[in-house]
Amino acid sequence: MLQKIRFSKRSYFLRQIYRIASEFGFNPIALILSITGIPLYIYQAIQFRLKNTFSESNFSVSSLSPCLKDRYQGDSHIDKHYFYQDLWAARKVYQNNPANHIDVGSRIDGFIAHLLTFRKVEVLDIRTIDSQIDGMTFRQADLMQFDSLPIAEYDSVSCLHALEHFGLGRYGDSIDPDGHIKGLKSLIMLLKPNGKLLLSVPIGRERIEFNAHRVFAVSTIVDLTSSNLDMISFSYINDNGEFYEDMSIQEIPTMNYGCGLFEFTKK
């Protein structure tokens, strides 16, 4: 077990180095895969040109646009946190079929897109959205500020992989070490009594990796919500990107950077 934890930490450290390098425009994995793909690309380009001479179609090669790394990536480029959490939450909303649903800060091109296939949804985000999307109503709002928020208006609220960013300045929000606490209070305020909250956050050894995110101990989320919310289900994604649904919080393995998926009902 200790060896697995050490491997997990090393793996996470390497991913962090990769992420930081990518922030500065350098993607070492993409570079290696692209260089690896050059000989095959040249061979296939020549092969295609020769075969195209005898083709019945009228397509001609107008320019070269190399895609060198796609064949090597498989599903390794998929962020398992977002992939599983978006499916998990969309299925919950579909099953619960609330009269109205509002989302705070989740990905438009993931979870919100899933929801829009079967219902209308309202979205709050501190960032602006320029696109007009049928079925989606957008309002710019800072969830650390309570004065502009509707109170007890929604049957269902979601906030996926967003709460951990509140107050760290990453998305243009103000610096506030208690931003996650204020944000969680706002989520609870939005809910009607007996309304459902779907929440996902990074879980593991509690810490801040400034200004990327917080990582929460599961007990912290439980403590912050226990007076206003009842937890009705808990699922998680472990360090290996494996999804475990409807688990007991008493049986959570040690993780460095997992994802906790919480389903609550407002008291």
Identify the role of each PLM range.
Residues 175-196:
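A short glycine-rich, Lys/Arg-flanked "PGG" loop and its adjoining helix->strand segment in the class I
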Residues 95, 100-146:
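Class I SAM-dependent methyltransferase SAM/SAH-binding core
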Residues 146-157:
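A short acidic, Gly/Pro-enriched loop at the edge of an enzyme's catalytic core
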Residues 218-267:
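Class I S-adenosyl-L-methionine
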Residues 48-99:
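Class I SAM-dependent methyltransferase Rossmann-like catalytic core
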Residues 158-163:
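A conserved beta-strand element that flanks and buttresses the S-adenosyl-L-methionine
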Residues 1-65:
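Membrane-proximal basic amphipathic "stem/tether" segments
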Residues 178, 199, 204-223:
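Acceptor-substrate binding/catalytic loop of class I
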